[in-house]
Amino acid sequence: MKALKRVIRMLLHTFLWPWRKAYRRRNGVAVQEERHELPNDAFLGLVGEKLAEGHTAVIWVKGYSMRPFIEFGRDRVKLAPFDELKVGDAVVAQIAPGHYVLHRIIQRDGERLTLQGDGNVRGVEHCLCGDVCGVVTEYIRPGRTLLASDKRLQRRIRLWRWLRPIRRYLLWLYRECI
């Protein structure tokens, strides 16, 4: 069992999270920055207004629903206004009055979008294209910035969507091994 766990951990690190391992090798000590947390409904409402004006915003991620691609307390994302939305894009959307989520589009049917977090096994949210505040253009990690349009990242996202039936077990291994 230990050998199997070790092999799976190696495969997960190789295909999904190589930047995390490289960061640990470069910097032995992680520095915790001081942050102030605001309620999502107030903060993301203001961010949505600025994005509607054409500005961009960088926000810290809260929660574990986008794990393993975005980690709570470690990663930030750069949000920007969008021209078009496609399946696979990570977006900030208002799914109910005052309730915002940062999730990935898994299905599009005209103006209706279906969203799901990468770390969610079940449960989806529905919204309209007009409810989307902004789209993620960059993933900012300590020591590295990844563009959302990066081909390697896009392949990993497609692979993760394809592995949806066994996602529960992969997430369990991720939590146990990391």
What are these regions (language model features)?
Residues 1-178:
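Extended hydrophobic leader/signal-anchor segments used for secretion and membrane insertion
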